[in-house]
């Protein structure tokens, strides 16, 4: 186990909990959080749709409401406003609700920006353009003024180029891949279809993510959860193995048993390979030691002395040491295991 954790560290995988490394060999379901894990996590505003106003007006109101937010989507909106040279007005009475959106007073009017949960909360109707945008896999944010939709923003987050290979490699190893996101179902299913993921939990609030992990566990699955945000921490703690990517928040990293130094989702496959490889070595060493001692101990005890076969004490001592040496050398072979994510996925395809 110590060699396995050392080998993992050299490959950019920090094993905080050795039991987590052991459990990875039995994982049969990996639950990926979409944003920042399967996607780059650097969203950009791809399009603006306005109703009764100009695009710049809608973007300006959205940027004003999002000024005090630290969410990646808020930063994308503010970047887009700056790129278009829009002067963002000061907002007051800011509030934020996870998986719902933000709200603020701008020039005395309540401006809200959010996804499908916001529309449900305000009993507002989604703009028709959102259906077209959803098919592209983009996140759709509606902008409301005093509870009425006045526009929508299409926010795209590029899928990591390594994500498809990670999903395929896990599937080839008999692992079910599941995606979880707070995005609307149409958006989530579009991304999942692009990645080849068949099962999706969409529209999930942050506080409900741990419940989805439990749902998989009730099906008899051993679940690994992969995430990077504060909202993922309860789910990471609930999973049989919590895996935080290196770019994740301190809370997510603190809740995980395994931490990936990089942001390549294929590293999850590397951890599974390491866990299975370490288990194979343990079994080999156990069978070797048991078989060796089954033969050597009776000989050393003189069971064949009546037949004239005896072992000098010096030979017995050497044979005793030989068993330990063989076990140690066999364990050292773990150092030769190539855990480079690209190499691991290539080996399976070959």
What label would you give each PLM region?
Residues 1-34, 170, 192-193, 201-202, ...:
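Hydrophobic alpha-helical transmembrane segments
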Residues 1-7, 12, 34, 38-47, ...:
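Conserved cytosolic headpiece of P-type ATPases
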Residues 15, 25, 108, 129, ...:
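Conserved ATP-binding TGD loop and adjacent catalytic N/P-domain core of P-type ATPases
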Residues 20-23, 86, 93-96, 132-136:
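Short loop/turn motifs at secondary-structure junctions and domain boundaries
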Residues 28-70, 100-178, 257-258, 329-337:
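ATP-driven catalytic headpiece of P-type ATPases
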Residues 29, 47, 85, 90-93, ...:
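Extracellular/lumenal ectodomain signal focusing on beta-strand-rich modules
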Residues 76-87:
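A short beta-strand->alpha-helix segment at the C-terminal rim
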Residues 81, 91-101:
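Short, solvent-exposed loop/turn elements at beta->coil junctions and helix N-caps
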């Amino acid at each position: 186990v110590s060699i396995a954790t050392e080998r993992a560290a050299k490959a950019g995988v920090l094993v905080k909990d050795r039991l987590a490394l052991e459990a990875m060999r039995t994982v049969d379901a990996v639950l990926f959080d979409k944003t920042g894990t399967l996607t780059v996590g650097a969203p950009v505003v791809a399009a603006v749709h306005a109703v009764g106003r100009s695009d710049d007006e809608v973007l300006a109101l959205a940027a004003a409401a999002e000024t005090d937010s630290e969410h990646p989507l808020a930063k994308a909106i503010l970047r887009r406003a700056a790129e278009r040279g829009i002067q963002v007005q000061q907002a007051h009475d800011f509030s934020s609700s996870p998986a719902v959106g933000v709200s603020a007073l701008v020039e005395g009017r309540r401006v809200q920006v959010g996804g499908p949960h916001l529309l449900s909360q305000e009993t507002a109707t989604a703009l028709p353009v959102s259906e077209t945008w959803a098919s592209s896999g983009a996140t759709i944010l509606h902008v409301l003024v005093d509870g009425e939709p006045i526009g929508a923003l299409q926010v795209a987050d590029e899928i990591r180029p390594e994500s498809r290979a990670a999903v395929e490699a896990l599937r080839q190893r008999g692992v079910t891949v599941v995606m979880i996101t707070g995005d609307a179902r149409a958006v989530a299913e579009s991304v999942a279809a692009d990645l080849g993921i068949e099962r999706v939990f969409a529209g999930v609030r942050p506080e409900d993510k741990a419940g989805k992990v439990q749902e998989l566990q009730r099906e008899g699955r051993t679940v690994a959860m992969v995430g990077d945000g504060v909202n993922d921490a309860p789910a990471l703690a609930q999973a049989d193995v919590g895996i935080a990517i290196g770019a994740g928040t301190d809370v997510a990293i603190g809740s995980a048993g395994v931490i990936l130094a990089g942001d390549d989702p294929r590293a999850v496959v590397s951890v599974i390979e390491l866990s299975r490889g370490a288990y194979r070595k343990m079994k080999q060493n156990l069978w070797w030691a048991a078989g060796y001692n089954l033969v050597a101990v009776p000989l050393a005890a003189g069971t064949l002395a009546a037949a004239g076969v005896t072992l000098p004490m010096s030979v017995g001592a050497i044979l005793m040491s030989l068993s330990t040496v063989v076990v140690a050398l066999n364990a050292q072979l773990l150092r030769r295991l190539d855990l480079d994510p690209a190499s691991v996925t290539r080996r399976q395809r070959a």
